[in-house]
Amino acid sequence: MGRRYFGTDGIRGTVGEAPITPDFVLRLGYAAGKVLAGSADVAAGSRPTVLIGKDTRVSGYMLEAALEAGFSAAGVDVMLAGPMPTPGVAYLTRALRLSAGVVISASHNPYHDNGIKFFSADGNKLPDDTEAAIEAWLDKPLECAPSDGLGKARRLDDAAGRYIEFCKSTFPAAFDLRGLKLVIDCAHGAAYQIAPHVFHELGADVIPIGVAPNGFNINDGVGATAPDALVRAVRANHADLGIALDGDADRLQVVDATGRLYNGDELLYVLVKDRIATDGKVDGAVGTLMTNLAVEVALQREGVKFVRAAVGDRYVLEQLREHGWQLGAEGSGHILSLDRHSTGDGIVSALLVLAALKRSGRTLAQVLDGVTLFPQKLINVRMKPGADWKGSASIRAAIDAAEAALAGSGRVLIRASGTEPVLRVMVEAQQAADAVRHAETIADAVRAATT
């Protein structure tokens, strides 16, 4: 039976609508607490402890209180980190040897959405069987622990400072950032106090933007999903580089002094090239079905195997573990470097990119010279609910014709949305006109067959 609530990145939705309601989140905390209390990892007679962090959405206060109440009712102690990037919660959970970590965030979504995601004691996302066990407990009545068995809650002292020191520890001790002017866009999100300190303490001249959260402006015209604000700030301040994080700081985009934007695909190539220079070789790297073909070709030219995972950092992580590799990324800016952190971390990834540039003495444009991204055309086609697009001969014929015309110099990717009756048609080609033409032809075939 499929999962009812957990998606690829926890539970997410619009605040006030199921399942992101205070009563459900209280029961979720209770259910998760009961699963943790029954875990073999909890020593006999001891009480599990979980860490809760959140981003800056106004609803975070309500959901934090609901989670805290649920955990307490299950007999689980709670530590409150306050505003904390998702990767910060993962790190602190592992470093403090806690039973689990919980993040209240909807990442890059607008303020009226929110979500809950969990980390295991080792700082990784929960395995599927644990999520299934939590869902099973949601169906059971809530039976509050006796008064002498209730969980307690307290604030974690200097949570931000601990995470800042961890981030700095991933940057080579032989380097610093003196002489660099950096614009840091924190998306009015969880890293608004943390990220500027990290780069400043390493010596950079930091110009922070997106650091005035009011509960309603997270990701609003700023951050990794709205990089125009960063481009303008870099140009206006004559900065060397700009770094944009999203609301929970697990992804990034980078802008150079000219205002050119670099996505996760390109940054993955930069990091792989750096590892080749320092370690002699890189066995392989992981991208997704959406990774630009030019990056795959460039990595293979360097002798690096490349594997495509399904879209989602969870699936990139699965492939990295399966192959025993370290580096993976999504074009959206989720970058995994498993010898540095157990999860995607926008701040740490930015530091890795800066270290790579320091070591090479080159700019991003110079490192990526010869890697020209193929133009992509994405068309979202709305279908009738339940339409059988896979069984359509006309759609199959349009796809086959496009693939034959591209003949290895491009790609066709057809992917159904997991949340709405939409088919995503993406074509990648060396020439933009070819990508547009083939995408529109396939989209027309989809419309004719499914609407």
Swiss-Prot record:
Binds 1 Mg(2+) ion per subunit. The active site is at 107 (phosphoserine intermediate). Its EC number is 5.4.2.10. Activated by phosphorylation. It is an enzyme of class 5 (isomerase). It catalyses: alpha-D-glucosamine 1-phosphate = D-glucosamine 6-phosphate. It comes from the Bacteria. Pfam families: PGM_PMM_I (PF02878), PGM_PMM_II (PF02879), PGM_PMM_III (PF02880), PGM_PMM_IV (PF00408). GO terms for cellular component: cytosol. PANTHER family: PHOSPHOGLUCOMUTASE (ALPHA-D-GLUCOSE-1,6-BISPHOSPHATE-DEPENDENT), PHOSPHOHEXOSE MUTASE. Belongs to the phosphohexose mutase family. This is Phosphoglucosamine mutase. It comes from Burkholderia cenocepacia (strain HI2424). The gene is glmM.
